[in-house]
Curated annotation (Swiss-Prot):
Keywords carried by this UniProt record: Plasmid
Protein name as annotated: Uncharacterized protein YuaK
Amino acid sequence: MVRRLRFSGPKTSIICSPMTSLKTSIKTITYLSDIGCLEIQGASLAGSGSGGEHAAVLYSLIGTCRLNNVELEKWLCYGIEHIQDWSANLVRDL
């Protein structure tokens, strides 16, 4: 099954396939500094101010994992599995 997601803002779309691995998706992320948003295979993730902020958080996490040779997929799985056990004020330490 292939899903097409549309975002407000520029008329672009992302095609999401369950067969596409997270690693493949990460390789196609580009930061567009001139307009302050992320792009995945030609589709803008930031159609609004808050969308840009969320995209910046995502990009920061991906970039930090790459710089520290951390496997993003394993790190995300660990975080998702353990986030319910942490108090809200300690989530940054996760």
